[in-house]
Swiss-Prot record:
Protein name (database record): tRNA (guanine-N(1)-)-methyltransferase
Disulfide bonds listed in the record: none
Any single Gene Ontology cellular-component annotation: cytosol
Its biological purpose: Specifically methylates guanosine-37 in various tRNAs.
Length: 255
């Protein structure tokens, strides 16, 4: 899979995109990441990419001409096509389902907004999708782009073990079960005995119940989504009912 990132600050990406899983994925040829400095498409000697907003107001706005030229040049590269995604606080909220969807694509073009945003006409003409990583404001879209690349890349086949993906938090709307490693006792705290039993069936059942318990305690809103998606078994529902879950989400009764 190919990631193209259009940004005013390409140096911000050098550390996060060249370490750990992303580094190994690139070395293995599973993904490629290409950084593009939007200033390279500015036409004046000062490489101007922003200007004051029409109508007045605080801050600056990213100009249409250099940004549009950058997007079109990247789209014209001799590679498979891909959607243009703008990272912006007013986009749809990014989640694991969107990450899975994007991971099926051969290419993704990410545009990092900055200042007060980009000229609206570029959004109307060239942007296919808008994504936000949360209900807060960052200095620019660079950090959001890093989050999207990391979340999507790990779902590309061959990047990480498929079993690890299945058991991760949010893979089926449930949070992940607790993890333990050696030593068996640390500062008086012992690893649950079931994990030392070698009984794989019992361990699997314990892990499932812990996923349900943790989700109920920390993110009960996810349980209604899990039930609606059909990922909760009768045994799951019985256990949740025993713990007091009544099928309600944050917005009311589960539909």
């Amino acid at each position: 899979m190919r990631f193209d990132i259009l940004t005013l600050f390409p140096a911000m990406f050098q550390g996060p995109l060249t370490e750990s899983i992303l580094k190994r994925a690139q070395q293995a040829g599973k993904i490629t990441i290409h950084l593009h400095d939007i200033r390279d498409w500015a036409t004046d000697r000062h490489r101007t990419v922003d200007d004051a907003p029409y109508g007045g107001g605080a801050g600056m706005v990213m100009k249409a001409e250099p940004l549009a030229a950058a997007i079109r040049a990247v789209q014209a590269a001799d590679e498979p096509g891909g959607p243009v995604v703008l990272l912006t606080p007013d986009g749809e909220l990014f989640n694991q389902s969107i990450a899975r969807e994007l991971a099926t694509l051969p290419r993704l073009i990410l545009v990092c907004g900055h200042y007060e945003g980009i000229d609206e006409r570029v959004r109307e003409r060239l942007v296919d999708r808008e994504i936000s990583i949360g209900d807060y404001v960052l200095t620019g879209g660079e950090l959001a782009a890093m989050v999207v690349v990391d979340a999507v890349a790990r779902l590309v086949p061959g990047v990480i073990d498929s079993e690890s993906i299945v058991e991760e938090s949010h893979s089926d709307f449930l949070l992940e079960y607790p993890h333990y490693t050696r030593p068996a006792v640390w500062e008086g705290l012992a690893v649950p005995s079931i994990l030392l039993s070698g009984h794989h069936g019992e361990i699997a059942r314990w892990r499932r119940s812990e996923r349900l318990r943790r989700t109920l305690a920390r993110r009960p809103d996810l349980l209604a989504r899990a039930a609606a998606a059909g990922v909760l078994t009768k045994a799951d529902l019985a256990l949740l009912a025993e713990w007091g879950w009544d099928g309600m989400s944050e917005g009311g009764w589960m539909s």
